[in-house]
């Protein structure tokens, strides 16, 4: 077996499959493009779903890739095991309706065992297969695999919801008896026992059925095109080929671990307690790549995942004695390890470091809050006479504050308390079940559509015309091809068309189709790309249409021009964002409609009003500069040399279209555009908002809509000026400010009057002191306007020695508000209010010294007051 670096393994994989006629698919962005079912790209096949479900036909049906991926269902296991990772590389080879089982197995065996390639010893390889899949068993035997090395496994059948599915065969490397201390042997594989002896290095999925959840597996229909989908983890291959005990001792992780050793002053021990080193090395890889691909830490979705990873890594840094910000210092090491195939980390190093360091600094403040929360929980345990911290509280510390359970346990034990491990595991499992359910729900590839995939007739979109005559090539009605149609809705393909198919954020053209007499025979309501790339017109049929007949196709010119104004303005906006807030503000999505444009971009904070003003001004300057718009068709490399901005994550063909707006903007784009920037007329931003962690959205209008937006603003300003009696529009702001100042003064005066009234009323309330169980208490119903007044009562009560406990009840509107305050350690206000609140059909809680509750049954207020003594 050859001893290769991870970069050599990756390159040898790609070279082998290229020698078998495969095209190399570049690694896609970790943030899925146009796939709301995925949080992250989580496998090599994830970016190829469009090929497997038949919605797009690839140029070459044989594909290979090395795809960076993220999976976060088992974050808590990272560092504990030899092979769990958040970010990993999946090497794959794929056949879309081309070769199948025989070639997949034979070539796979050749790559692994040939001296020209990986040169694995054959006697160290074991294969599992689906028991009913005798063909795979026989093919392995034909390759020279001993029957004793073939293990039937019932679970070797791959399916996720509806869509392509089939048996799979997995390849394992046997590391020997040293990794099997109990000498269990092949039962480890046959019974799926977690072990370090048999390492799964490759899975070959034989995708031959259309899975249908409504029928038994035995009734699945055969796919019209059978596919091959494989995945081999680079980290595992590297561990095996480099003789490493775990994935972390390979050249993919050890340089990071060495840097952590320098920062911590600690030494990594492969056989000792090294979990913190592993967690940090794994998580900084995921953070560096994900942030480089446009994801940013936040409170939801993928942003929440990144925040959780960073906080877990920071806490493990503290366990190693690293108390200052340090993760950002590891970003260059990650970039250097991966530079040969993934240059983007080093290219975006400054930005990634900035985001990581900023998030570390924010978390330092959060740690203080988490420590305070833990202190409060431990104090509550002491007051209640308990000795165990509940699982739900441990999980909150873990989930909200980023405290690893080991740290919580350590701090709790130092204070003399135990922790509820089982309760924590239960809370963790509930979260994992929710996450996995969401993945299963959204993971289906969708069924193949044989009718659409079967369209092979050529069709060409013509950019520079609004009307043309063309022959009708294909009619599809009720999902079947037909020669003619006279009513209903149908899908049409023409030899050439002026209708733009929805793509790249630009909506489809609408229009009409006319016969040779000039009569309208169909209305075009949508245009989408067919699997083989032809514009597929969805039409409402008004009169007879037949294949082979020529028709005149006319788009709605006014609508097209409105869309083009917004699309061209989008390019100007993208460039302006780069200039004003930074080059990290890359496109995360766009929509160019007739009435507006919507542009999503990566950014870590809200765009300020001043920045929006600069962006809007810069775009309008380019409109007024009368810039010529040109388009050029070339290859991707030449386009990049021209300075063209490519959308990261998009896949481009051999020939790309470059849209250049003067010397201001150059982008790869297949959409339609104006001839000159001045045709946009006017640009106005109407909204800026956050739509998810690290993603902002700008909605803007152009031309007539921009004018209307400005006029509406002016009308609103005139109305405000009239309301505040401003003599001129320019005086309206000053008048509003004067009224606001006056209102604030009146509100302050009102608060002072309320406080005086409360203080006067408190004198009477505080006179009625009772005693029970050795505790002096006051229990009274008071007449106040809001719950804040109850707190004012409590503040006044605390200043003097009226009693040990105060209980106040107020009926405010239809609600009942209850306050309990305590000055004695013998009475816990939060616990006491839990006993009182249910009397008035309410609930509440709080701290030992102050608690509040809300209820709905005012008729029971007297009963609540009577129950105070027994609840002390």
UniProtKB/Swiss-Prot annotation:
Protein name according to UniProt? Alanine--tRNA ligase
List, separated by semicolons, the cofactors it needs: Zn(2+)
- Cofactor comment text: Binds 1 zinc ion per subunit.
Q: Which organism is it from?
A: Streptococcus agalactiae serotype V (strain ATCC BAA-611 / 2603 V/R)
GO CC terms of this entry? cytosol
Record bears the keyword ATP-binding:
yes
Q: Does Metal-binding appear among the keywords?
A: yes
Q: Which CDD domains match?
A: AlaRS_core
Pfam hit, one: tRNA_SAD
Enzyme Commission number(s): 6.1.1.7
Going by the entry's taxonomy, the superkingdom of the source organism is recorded as Bacteria
Q: What biological-process terms (Gene Ontology) are attached?
A: alanyl-tRNA aminoacylation
Localization, UniProt: Cytoplasm
Q: What does this protein do?
A: Catalyzes the attachment of alanine to tRNA(Ala) in a two-step reaction: alanine is first activated by ATP to form Ala-AMP and then transferred to the acceptor end of tRNA(Ala). Also edits incorrectly charged Ser-tRNA(Ala) and Gly-tRNA(Ala) via its editing domain.
Keywords of this entry: Aminoacyl-tRNA synthetase, ATP-binding, Cytoplasm, Ligase, Metal-binding, Nucleotide-binding, Protein biosynthesis, RNA-binding, tRNA-binding, Zinc
UniProt domain comment: Consists of three domains; the N-terminal catalytic domain, the editing domain and the C-terminal C-Ala domain. The editing domain removes incorrectly charged amino acids, while the C-Ala domain, along with tRNA(Ala), serves as a bridge to cooperatively bring together the editing and aminoacylation centers thus stimulating deacylation of misacylated tRNAs.
Q: Can you tell me which residues bind Zn(2+)?
A: 567, 571, 669, 673
Report the Gene3D superfamilies cross-referenced here: 2.40.30.130, 3.10.310.40, 3.30.54.20, 6.10.250.550, Bira Bifunctional Protein, Domain 2, Threonyl-trna Synthetase, Chain A, domain 2
What enzyme class is recorded for this protein? ligase
Q: Which family does it belong to?
A: Belongs to the class-II aminoacyl-tRNA synthetase family.
What molecular function terms (GO) are annotated for this protein? Answer: alanine-tRNA ligase activity; aminoacyl-tRNA deacylase activity; ATP binding; catalytic activity, acting on a protein; transferase activity; tRNA binding; zinc ion binding
- What's the catalysed reaction? tRNA(Ala) + L-alanine + ATP = L-alanyl-tRNA(Ala) + AMP + diphosphate
Q: Which SMART domains match?
A: tRNA_SAD
């Amino acid at each position: 077996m050859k001893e290769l670096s991870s970069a050599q393994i990756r390159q040898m994989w790609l070279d082998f499959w290229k020698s078998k006629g495969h095209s190399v698919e570049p690694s896609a962005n970790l943030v899925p493009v146009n796939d709301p079912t995925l949080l992250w790209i989580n496998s090599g096949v994830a970016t190829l779903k469009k090929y497997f479900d038949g919605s797009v036909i690839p140029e070459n049906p044989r594909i290979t890739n090395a795809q960076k991926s993220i999976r976060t269902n088992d974050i808590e296991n990272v560092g504990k095991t030899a092979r769990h990772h958040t970010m990993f590389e999946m090497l794959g080879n794929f056949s879309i309706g081309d070769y199948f089982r025989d070639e997949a197995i034979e070539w796979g065996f050749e790559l692994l065992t040939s001296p020209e390639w990986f040169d694995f010893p054959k006697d160290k390889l074991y294969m599992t297969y689906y028991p009913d899949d005798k063909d795979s068993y026989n093919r392995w035997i034909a390759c020279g695999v001993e029957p004793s090395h073939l293990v039937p496994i019932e679970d070797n059948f791959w399916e996720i919801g509806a869509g392509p599915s089939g048996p799979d065969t997995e390849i394992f490397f046997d590391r020997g008896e040293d990794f099997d201390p109990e000498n269990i042997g092949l039962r480890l594989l046959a019974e799926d026992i977690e072990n370090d002896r048999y390492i799964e290095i490759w899975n070959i999925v034989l995708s031959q059925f259309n899975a249908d959840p409504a029928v038994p597996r035995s009734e699945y229909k055969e796919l019209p095109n059978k596919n091959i989908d494989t995945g081999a983890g680079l980290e595992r291959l590297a561990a095996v080929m480099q003789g490493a005990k775990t994935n972390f001792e390979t050249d993919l992780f050890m340089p990071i671990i060495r840097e952590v050793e320098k920062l911590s002053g600690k030494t990594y021990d492969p056989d000792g307690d090294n979990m913190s080193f592993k967690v940090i090395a794994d998580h900084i890889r995921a953070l560096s790549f994900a942030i480089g691909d446009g994801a940013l830490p936040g409170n939801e979705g993928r942003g929440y995942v990144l925040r959780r990873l960073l906080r877990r890594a920071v806490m493990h840094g503290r366990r190693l004695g690293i108390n200052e910000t340090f993760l950002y210092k590891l970003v260059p090491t990650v970039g250097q390890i991966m530079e040969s195939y993934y240059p983007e980390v080093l290219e975006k190093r400054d930005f990634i470091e900035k985001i990581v360091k900023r998030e570390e600094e924010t978390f330092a403040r959060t740690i203080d809050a988490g420590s305070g929360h833990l202190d409060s929980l431990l104090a509550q345990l002491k007051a209640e006479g308990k000795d165990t911290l509940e699982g739900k509280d441990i999980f909150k510390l873990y989930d909200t504050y980023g405290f690893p359970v080991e740290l919580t346990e350590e701090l709790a034990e130092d204070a003399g308390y135990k922790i509820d491990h089982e309760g924590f595991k239960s809370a963790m499992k509930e979260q994992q079940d929710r996450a996995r359910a969401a993945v299963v729900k959204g993971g289906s590839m969708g069924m193949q559509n044989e009718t659409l995939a079967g369209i092979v007739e050529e069709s060409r979109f013509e950019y520079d015309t609004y009307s043309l005559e063309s022959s009708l090539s294909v009619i599809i009605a009720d999902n079947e091809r037909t020669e003619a149609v006279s009513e209903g809705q149908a899908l049409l393909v023409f030899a050439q068309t002026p209708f733009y198919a929805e793509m790249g954020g630009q909506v489809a053209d609408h229009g009409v189709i006319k016969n040779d007499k000039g009569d309208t025979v169909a209305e075009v309501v949508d245009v989408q790309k067919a699997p083989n790339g032809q514009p597929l017109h969805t039409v409402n049929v008004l009169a007879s249409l037949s294949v082979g007949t020529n028709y005149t196709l006319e788009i709605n010119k006014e609508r097209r021009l409105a869309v083009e104004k917004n699309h061209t303005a989008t390019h100007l906006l993208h460039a302006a964002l780069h200039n004003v807030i930074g080059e990290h503000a890359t496109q995360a999505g766009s929509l160019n409609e007739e009435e507006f444009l919507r542009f999503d971009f990566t950014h870590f904070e809200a765009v300020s009003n001043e920045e929006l003003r600069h962006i809007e001004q810069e775009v309008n300057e380019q409109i007024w500069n009368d810039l010529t718009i040109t388009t050029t068709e070339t290859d991707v490399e030449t386009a990049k040399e021209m300075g063209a901005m490519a959308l990261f994550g998009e896949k481009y063909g051999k020939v790309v279209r470059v849209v250049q707006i003067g010397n201001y903007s150059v982008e790869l784009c297949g959409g339609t555009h104006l001839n000159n920037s001045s045709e946009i007329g006017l640009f106005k931003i109407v909204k800026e908002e956050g739509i998810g962690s690290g993603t902002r959205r700008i909605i803007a209008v152009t031309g007539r809509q921009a004018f209307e937006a400005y006029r509406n603003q002016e009308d609103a300003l005139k109305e405000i000026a009239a309301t505040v009696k401003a003599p001129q529009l320019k005086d309206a702001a000053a008048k509003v400010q004067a009224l606001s100042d006056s209102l604030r003064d009146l509100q302050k005066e009102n608060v002072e009057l309320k406080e005086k009234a409360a203080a006067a009323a408190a004198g009477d309330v505080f006179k009625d002191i009772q005693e029970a169980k050795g505790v002096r208490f006051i229990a009274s119903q008071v007449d106040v306007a809001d719950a804040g007044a109850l707190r004012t009562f409590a503040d006044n009560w605390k200043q003097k020695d009226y009693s040990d406990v105060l209980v106040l009840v107020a009926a405010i509107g239809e609600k009942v508000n209850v306050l309990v305050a305590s000055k004695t350690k013998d009475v816990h206000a939060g616990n006491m209010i839990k006993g009182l609140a249910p009397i008035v059909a309410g609930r509440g809680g709080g701290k030992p010294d102050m608690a509040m509750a809300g209820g709905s049954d005012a008729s029971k207020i007297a009963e609540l007051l009577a129950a105070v003594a027994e609840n002390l």
